[in-house]
Swiss-Prot record:
KH domain: residues covered: 554-613
Residues that bind Mg(2+): D487, D493
Identification of the protein by name: Polyribonucleotide nucleotidyltransferase
Catalytic activity: RNA(n+1) + phosphate = RNA(n) + a ribonucleoside 5'-diphosphate
NCBIfam families: polynuc_phos, PRK11824.1
Pfam families per record: KH_1 (PF00013), PNPase (PF03726), RNase_PH (PF01138), RNase_PH_C (PF03725), S1 (PF00575)
Function field: Involved in mRNA degradation. Catalyzes the phosphorolysis of single-stranded polyribonucleotides processively in the 3'- to 5'-direction.
Protein's cellular compartments: Cytoplasm
Segments forming domain S1 motif: 623-691
Length: 712
């Protein structure tokens, strides 16, 4: 019934198995991939023909994690998986980026990749396995695809590169880098690092590229026995249209791209486009080409002319040379009632970034396959349509916004203080108010400024820069701080963020083969110069974190209590801690290890809560004098509440220096009194004395002390 084919190899010390022919047989391509004991199913379906009027390649990648893969049941009311999590969105992008450039130009059939994690061994991250399984499924499917693609994760532990480290090894690694590519080219890099130099980062890329070569061999081996017949796809030949259009519009387009102001440049390009449309799409008579074909070739021509201009003149669209960064203006304290704020403007790209400090209650609970954990640093990136002068949909963030926010998050996180050093939850929101390229890197810069303005003790300021690279034969140009118009026409787009001493995040997307290690080295070196320049411009606004928090930020004091006392502080059903919160006004968060965080904007409220908790967990000291309240009287003495919730007995003989006939003659319930802790009886009961303490001053009476010492 099943025509199954399997290939198995040893990869980085674990078995990798690729199997096809048994599951999801109606998909164009389906591969069940196993690494260690993590299992994913990747499927590919591509329509047999494009939709009429389709003018782009509609590729969709859906990565989904099923909770049953880790032996869990989903939370929530409905107890089933819902909308994609942030991690699922990020892995979907990770799979998409290296495969998208490998579909032939002109292929416009609806194509969907669905990757499902169906088993997780809690050791091997399914993201790399998903990339491999997707590549294998595409290679087998018969869909036109110039693969296969391999992928690998690279760690850097104790000065050594590690291929596909286990999940628990990542805690020791100063690098988390994912690289994907073909036999002879790197196509995609995504990474987070702890201030590593450029040569170490580039070395990791090449190490990963070499590391996934056996995977490519395995995919080819599987395809040799299981691949479907390739679909017959011949891209349309538009060389005649391009040649004619070039003759008609080249001179005017070159002039249009000499205009440095974005709006004026767009107007000039639109005028040329209108002329081209009028020529090739006349209102009267039958047009030789469709509007989609004319539009696509015009777009292609725009890219060619900009590339030629840059390579020929070493001058760019806005008049800059290759290495110059656009003018930068940095401001902090823009919104004085917020906890920290910054306005970062670089040319026509601008971000308002606001930092908010919260308590442990504000931490985000993340329910992942590997278990529940709490995230104390959140970074949200918003890209409204007005930022590019357009109208558009507003609502929940899209994949691009989530991806850009995570890139900035990775860049900043290595410089954040530890929870012990700075026990706040941090949320940063970046509002992109203008965009003409590199808005994610503007977010990195703005976040660094806003956090320093908020008084968050960042180890060092962080800056980011977006770079481009154009390669034609043996000529190439590296562009620093690319514009939006330059973003899509390059052969390599990469974003580098870091401090003056090293890289904290690197993202690369390489679209063609032929970009050598040497070219990447030049590009990273130029990016380092740009990053250093940007850090200098940021320093004009603020050079280091403020010494104190903003006026409106909450204060947090941390204290530690014995674990066995947690129950006493919380009380039955939370009664005690609720009373402390209600009466002091402070927020209180208690961890399982006995760490107590007390938060309030008022120092008095924090101190009141701290004293209250201390009185519950601390033990009274023998010989110390305490103020107390009489809570009950009896014939043999009075019970005094003197240390938090602790009561003790003042025996009738200890009420006063003279003989006392009746307890009520000396004290009544509710009286405030001073008592000295004499000790504990054989049953552990507290023994208190009033007669050795001056009830007016709370000071010990000297002669009574001598009598007491003599009696002892």
């Amino acid at each position: 019934m099943f025509d199954t084919h399997t290939v198995e190899i040893e990869w980085a010390g674990r078995p990798l198995k690729l199997e096809t022919g048994k599951i999801a047989r109606q998909a164009d391509g389906a591969v069940l991939a196993t690494y260690g004991e993590t299992v994913v199913l990747a499927t590919v379906v591509s329509a047999k023909a494009p939709k009429p009027g389709q003018d782009f390649f509609p590729l969709t990648v859906n990565y989904q994690e099923k909770t049953y893969a880790a032996g869990k049941i989903p939370g929530g009311y409905f107890k089933r998986e819902g909308r994609p999590s942030e991690n699922e969105t990020l892995v979907s992008r990770l799979i998409d980026r290296p495969i998208r450039p490998l579909f032939p130009e002109g292929y416009k059939n609806d194509t969907q990749v669905v990757v499902t994690v169906i088993q997780h061994d809690l050791e091997n991250n399914p993201d790399i396995l998903s990339m491999v399984a997707t590549s294998a499924a595409l290679t087998l499917s018969g869909v036109p695809f110039m693969g296969p693609v391999g992928g690998a994760r690279v760690g850097y532990i104790n000065g050594e590169y590690v291929l596909n480290p286990h999940l628990d090894e990542m805690d020791e690694s100063s690098l988390d880098l994912v690289v994907a590519g073909t036999y002879d080219a790197v196509l995609m890099v995504e990474s987070e690092a702890k201030e590593l130099p450029e040569d170490v980062m580039l070395g990791a890329v090449m190490f990963g590229h070499k590391g996934f070569q056996p995977v490519l061999d395995a995919i080819i081996k599987l395809a040799e026995v299981a691949a479907k017949e390739p679909r017959d796809f011949q891209p349309e030949d538009y060389s005649a249209l391009e040649s004619e259009m070039l003759g008609l519009a080249e001179a005017e387009l070159r002039e249009a791209y000499k205009i440095t102001q974005k709006a004026d440049r767009y107007a000039a390009v639109d005028a040329v486009k209108a002329k081209v449309k009028a020529h090739f799409l006349p209102e009267e008579g039958e047009a030789k080409y469709t509007a989609e074909e004319v539009g696509a070739i015009f777009k292609h021509l725009q890219a060619k002319i900009v590339r030629w201009n840059i390579l020929d003149t070493k001058s760019r669209i806005d008049g800059r040379d290759l290495e110059t960064v656009r003018p930068i203006v940095s401001e902090v304290g823009l919104l004085p009632r917020t906890h920290g704020s910054a306005l970062f403007t670089r040319g026509e790209t601008q971000a308002i970034v606001v930092a908010t400090l919260g308590t442990g209650e504000d931490e985000q609970y993340v329910d992942s396959l590997t278990g529940m954990y709490k995230e104390r640093f959140l970074l949200h990136y918003n890209f409204p349509p007005y930022s590019v002068g357009e109208t558009g949909r507003m609502g929940s963030p899209g994949r691009r916004e989530i991806g850009h926010g995570k890139l900035a998050w990775r860049a900043i996180r290595p410089m954040l203080p530890s929870a012990e050093q700075f026990p706040y939850t941090l949320r940063v929101v970046s509002e992109i108010t203008e965009s003409n390229g590199s808005s994610s890197m503007a977010t990195v810069c703005g976040t660094s400024l806003a956090l320093m303005d908020a008084g968050v003790p960042l180890a060092k300021p962080v800056a980011g820069i977006a770079m481009g690279l154009i390669l034609e034969g043996d000529r190439f140009a590296v562009l620093s701080d690319i514009l939006g118009d330059e973003d899509h026409l390059g052969d390599m787009d990469f974003k580098v963020a870091g401090t003056a001493d090293g890289i904290t995040s690197l993202q690369m997307d390489i679209k063609i083969a032929g970009i050598t290690e040497e070219i990447m080295k030049v590009a990273l070196s130029q990016a380092q110069g740009g990053r250093t320049h940007i850090l200098g411009e940021m320093a004009k606004a603020i050079t280091e974190s403020r010494g104190q928090l903003g006026e409106f930020a909450p204060r947090i004091e941390v204290m530690n209590i014995p674990v066995d006392k947690i129950r006493e502080v919380i009380g039955s059903g939370g009664k005690v801690i609720r009373e402390i919160v209600e009466k002091t006004g402070a927020k209180i968060n208690i961890e399982d290890d006995g760490t107590v965080k007390i938060a309030s904007s008022s120092g008095k409220e924090i101190e009141a809560a701290r004293k209250w908790i201390h009185s519950i967990v601390a033990e009274p000291e023998i010989g110390q004098i305490y103020e107390g309240t009489v809570v009950k009287t009896a014939d043999f003495g009075a019970f005094v509440n003197f240390f938090g919730a602790r009561d003790g007995l003042v025996h009738i003989s200890q009420l006063a220096s003279e003989r006392v006939a009746k307890t009520q003659d000396v004290v009544k319930e509710g009286d405030k009194v001073w008592v000295k802790l004499l000790g504990f009886d054989e049953r552990g009961k507290v023994r208190l004395s009033m007669k050795v303490v001056d009830q007016a001053t709370g000071q010990e009476i000297a002669n009574e002390k001598k009598k007491e010492e003599a009696a002892e």
